[in-house]
């Protein structure tokens, strides 16, 4: 076996158990790559790929979840010393909850032969991920049941995440829309059942095809759902995504490490600084930055505030989709109280872009404790009222209990995380399982449900808010003293008070805030327990002022893909409650 060292570490670390297991089975057939994030990473030959993936899926403590699957265009990458020759790389990020560990499998491909076998027979959620890779890179997955575009229209030309594809609007011919082009684009939106393997009629009846969206209040965003109906029963359904796609991963390749922060806020546009956290942490790991305890605590406190604002909106719209109009207005009032605190601390409400590489944009303002304490005194009583007045309502329970139900095994197979997974009885919360940002120092519980239905998913979200309130109170009571930003040359922006010392400090400050810092070459993934599930940023640095490749893994993408397996055979009304219960934001799905 050849071992590749990409990022040297002075400390000798034990060989991960999964590497030993692979060595016993495939000695000499794979290459180990060391990464900053310490996730075991191995390169395998394309011919061995499915065998290796199946082996990992069937280990005694198996890697049951395909957490992520994507690709990297390696053709312009300069700093990849020792790695196997590759024009394009397809990677598989696998997760084992029993081991509480991950493994990353990579396959090298040449530009002349962009083919790799499909993994849909091993993990059903590979379907959408492989379609996305084809859409963005043009890599073909042989054996895929329906390899078509997923984020872009089917008439789109080119594959945007290839390096030769332009990244700026000024590099394209100016866009225009005349009547003929509009009609062409509209015609391409026509749903043709045969293209999806659907029949227009059954043995004794004709099916009806119903479009919900892309502009529909129950779609929770620009999203189209096509239902194949036999009366009120859903025979099959096709979630049609991509209407909110903005090319966030492509944008990351043309923004400095610092200037990409505002874009992260707009992935899950309800998550605020929670979106910034995995990106910032990945960059900090690459740079070797250790942030001060005060910055850690501030980050945790503000992240939990956004968890509360997200969950309040979720619960309100959940009840609204079931027919209860009143609670959502009360919950908007409560969200306003939370946003008053957020705005006082960060200067903005929903998209503060406030975390910085190395810490936060500034320190907490004077009087922040009073604002936080007032919110903590207000919110618990309100949650009690919502549970008593709305969530224990017999009509709501009748609409949601036993509806859109799935078990833990199904959730893991489809890559479901967050409240959707915990509602099946599995108490997996990354803040407990793999503490980050000092979460191991906080006293809080992991709410779980046991029925895996729409009602349990909602109640888990309610209990999450109670735990967030506990965490925020501990942050307030135990806020450390000290700096709010690391004293590190790659922290951005550098301290302003040092810029006037001499010409060198002034030049360094100018370069940092204009061109941006140069981050060390390497790869790093950071996963956080975000508002809707597990969110990760996998960053590849080529020792430049901008990211070479930024992969954004979002929970909504995985959760929507599961929909047909849950809803087929149910009623149209159940499909609406399923969408209401999985907490989707289409910007989070489409990126």
From Swiss-Prot:
Coiled-coil annotated residue ranges, if any: none
InterPro entries in the record: NADH_DH_suC, NADH_DH_suCD, NADH_Q_OxRdtase_suD, NADH_quin_OxRdtase_su_C/D-like, NADH_UbQ_OxRdtase_30kDa_su, NADH_UbQ_OxRdtase_49kDa_CS, NDH1_su_D/H, NiFe-Hase_large
Record's bilayer topology term: Peripheral membrane protein
Enzyme Commission number(s) from the entry: 7.1.1.-
Gene Ontology CC terms: NADH dehydrogenase complex; plasma membrane
Listed Pfam families: Complex1_30kDa (PF00329), Complex1_49kDa (PF00346)
Keyword Cell inner membrane assigned: yes
Cell location: Cell inner membrane
Region annotated NADH dehydrogenase I subunit D, chain positions: 206-591
Region (NADH dehydrogenase I subunit C): 1-182
Magnesium found in the keyword field: no
Catalysis performed (reactions): a quinone + NADH + 5 H(+)(in) = a quinol + NAD(+) + 4 H(+)(out)
Protein family (similarity comment): In the N-terminal section; belongs to the complex I 30 kDa subunit family.
Function: NDH-1 shuttles electrons from NADH, via FMN and iron-sulfur (Fe-S) centers, to quinones in the respiratory chain. The immediate electron acceptor for the enzyme in this species is believed to be ubiquinone. Couples the redox reaction to proton translocation (for every two electrons transferred, four hydrogen ions are translocated across the cytoplasmic membrane), and thus conserves the redox energy in a proton gradient.
Oligomer and partners: NDH-1 is composed of 13 different subunits. Subunits NuoB, CD, E, F, and G constitute the peripheral sector of the complex.
Protein name: NADH-quinone oxidoreductase subunit C/D
Biological source species: Psychrobacter cryohalolentis (strain ATCC BAA-1226 / DSM 17306 / VKM B-2378 / K5)
Gene: nuoC
């Amino acid at each position: 076996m050849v071992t590749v060292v990409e990022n040297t570490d002075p400390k000798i670390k034990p060989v991960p158990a999964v590497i030993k297991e692979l060595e016993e089975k495939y000695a000499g057939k794979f290459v180990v790559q060391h990464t900053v994030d310490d996730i075991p990473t191995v390169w395998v030959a394309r011919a061995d790929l499915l065998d290796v993936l199946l082996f990992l899926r069937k280990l005694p403590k198996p890697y049951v979840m395909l957490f992520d699957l994507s690709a990297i265009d390696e053709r312009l990458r300069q700093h990849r010393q020792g790695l196997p020759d590759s024009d394009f790389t397809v990677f598989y990020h696998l997760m084992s909850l029993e081991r509480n560990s991950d493994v990353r499998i990579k396959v090298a491909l040449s530009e002349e032969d962009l083919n790799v076998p499909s993994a849909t027979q091993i993990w059903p959620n590979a379907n959408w991920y492989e379609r996305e890779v084809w859409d963005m890179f043009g890599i073909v997955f042989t054996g895929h049941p329906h390899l078509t575009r997923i984020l872009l229209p089917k008439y789109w030309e080119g594959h945007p995440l290839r390096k030769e594809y332009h990244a700026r609007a000024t590099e394209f011919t100016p866009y225009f829309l005349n009547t003929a082009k509009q009609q062409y684009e509209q015609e391409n939106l026509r749903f043709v059942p045969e293209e999806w393997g659907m029949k227009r009629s059954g043995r004794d009846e004709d099916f009806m095809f119903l479009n919900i969206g892309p502009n529909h209040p129950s779609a929770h965003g620009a999203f189209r759902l096509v239902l194949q109906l036999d009366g009120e029963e859903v025979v099959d359904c096709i979630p049609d995504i991509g209407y909110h796609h903005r090319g966030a991963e492509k944008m990351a390749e043309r923004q400095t490490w610092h200037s990409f922060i505002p874009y992260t806020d707009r992935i899950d546009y309800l998550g605020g600084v929670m979106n910034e956290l995995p990106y910032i942490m990945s960059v900090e790991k690459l740079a070797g930055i250790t942030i001060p305890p005060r910055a850690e605590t501030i980050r945790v406190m503000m992240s939990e505030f956004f968890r509360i604002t997200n969950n309040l909106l979720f619960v309100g719209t959940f009840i609204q989709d079931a027919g209860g109009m009143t609670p959502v207005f009360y919950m908007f009032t409560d969200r306003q109280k939370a946003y008053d605190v957020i705005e006082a601390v960060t200067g903005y409400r929903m998209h503060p872009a406030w975390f910085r590489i190395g810490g936060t944009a500034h320190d907490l303002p004077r009087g922040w404790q009073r604002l936080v304490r007032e919110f903590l005194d207000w919110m618990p009583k309100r949650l009690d009222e919502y549970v008593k007045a709305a969530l224990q309502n017999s009509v709501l329970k009748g609409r949601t209990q036993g509806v859109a139900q799935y078990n833990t095994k199904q959730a893991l197979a489809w890559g479901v995380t967050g409240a959707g997974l915990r509602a099946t009885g599995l108490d997996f919360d990354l803040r407990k399982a793999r503490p980050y940002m000092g979460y191991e120092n906080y006293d809080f519980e992991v709410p779980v449900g046991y029925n895996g239905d729409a009602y349990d998913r909602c109640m888990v979200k309610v209990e999450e808010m109670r735990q967030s309130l506990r965490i925020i109170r501990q942050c307030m009571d135990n806020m450390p003293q000290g700096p709010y930003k690391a004293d590190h040359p790659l922290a951005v922006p550098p301290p302003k008070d040092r810029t006037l010392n001499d010409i060198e400090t002034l030049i360094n400050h100018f370069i940092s805030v204009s061109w941006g810092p140069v981050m060390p070459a390497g790869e790093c993934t950071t996963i956080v327990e975000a508002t809707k599930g597990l969110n990760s940023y996998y960053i590849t640095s080529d020792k430049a002022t901008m990211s070479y490749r930024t992969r954004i893994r979002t929970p909504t993408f995985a959760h929507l893909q599961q929909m047909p397996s849950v809803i087929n055979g149910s009623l149209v009304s159940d499909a609406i409650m399923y969408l209401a219960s999985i907490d989707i934001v289409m910007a989070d799905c489409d990126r």
